[in-house]
Amino acid sequence: MAIDLLSTFIKPMHREGTKFVAIFAVVTLVLFLIWEPLGWIGVGLTVWCYYFFRDPVRVTPTREGLIVSPADGVVSLIEPAVPPAELGMGPAPMTRVSVFMNVFDCHVNRAPIGGTVTAVAYRPGKFLNASLDKASEDNERNALAIRLADGRQIAVVQIAGLVARRILCEVREGTPLLTGERFGMIRFGSRLDVYLPEGVQPLVCLGQVMTSGETVLADLTSPEARRTGAAR
């Protein structure tokens, strides 16, 4: 019982967070030496840092054709948009679904569908609020093109935010990916854009809470029309 309770709160941590947690812990020790109340503030910040870099196990649906959310967060935009030019996917608009991550969300990014990475392109840029429309065009970003088994392509774009200053991408051209497989993360608040193939409708709604690697975002085999929703 106690172990189950602990596992609810204690999750694995992404290796990217090790140095940050160590720095916070050292600063906390110094703060305790200066003044105990400051030390307890440091403890709180250290716990938050660990929580930010958590990397929990996710149960990913494995049926062929399902596209899952690449990030934890909230669906902030659903609109037609041309994928990043640096991916070379052409000028035709695709349906773009944006998932905004705040500083309390898990920031590990996962592949929305299995396939082979055909392009990885980093572009420096601004650090506007990631929830804004123009963040897709103006902010620092790292874009991936993934070719599916049937030859179609999707794009996944990691976008830095107002606080984020570090995009981590752990794959390169030619890397095979499984649906829900980890491929990177963004530190301290950001956004993920997914560009769906032509004719594929999103099965999520604006404002919907997403769980990376688990929430079904779209289905390549479904004739269902785009979903609508209401807050209740």
UniProtKB/Swiss-Prot annotation:
Signal peptide as annotated in the record: none
Localisation: Cell membrane
Cofactor (UniProt): pyruvate
Cysteines joined through disulfide linkages: none
GO molecular function: phosphatidylserine decarboxylase activity
Keyword hit for Cell membrane: yes
Post-translational modification: Is synthesized initially as an inactive proenzyme. Formation of the active enzyme involves a self-maturation process in which the active site pyruvoyl group is generated from an internal serine residue via an autocatalytic post-translational modification. Two non-identical subunits are generated from the proenzyme in this reaction, and the pyruvate is formed at the N-terminus of the alpha chain, which is derived from the carboxyl end of the proenzyme.
Residue(s) at site: Cleavage (non-hydrolytic): G189, S190
Pathway: Phospholipid metabolism; phosphatidylethanolamine biosynthesis; phosphatidylethanolamine from CDP-diacylglycerol: step 2/2
A single cellular component GO annotation: plasma membrane
Membrane topology: Peripheral membrane protein
Catalytic activity: a 1,2-diacyl-sn-glycero-3-phospho-L-serine + H(+) = a 1,2-diacyl-sn-glycero-3-phosphoethanolamine + CO2
Cell cycle among keywords: no
Residues at the active site: S190 (schiff-base intermediate with substrate)
Cofactor note: Binds 1 pyruvoyl group covalently per subunit.
GO terms under biological process: phosphatidylethanolamine biosynthetic process
Record's keyword terms, sorted: Cell membrane, Decarboxylase, Lipid biosynthesis, Lipid metabolism, Lyase, Membrane, Phospholipid biosynthesis, Phospholipid metabolism, Pyruvate, Zymogen
Annotated positions of the Pyruvic acid (Ser) modification: S190
First-tier enzyme category under EC: lyase
EC number: 4.1.1.65
PANTHER family xref list: ARCHAETIDYLSERINE DECARBOXYLASE PROENZYME-RELATED (PTHR35809:SF1)
Family statement drawn from the similarity comment of this UniProt entry: Belongs to the phosphatidylserine decarboxylase family. PSD-A subfamily.
Quaternary context: Heterodimer of a large membrane-associated beta subunit and a small pyruvoyl-containing alpha subunit.
Main function: Catalyzes the formation of phosphatidylethanolamine (PtdEtn) from phosphatidylserine (PtdSer).
Protein name (database record): Phosphatidylserine decarboxylase proenzyme
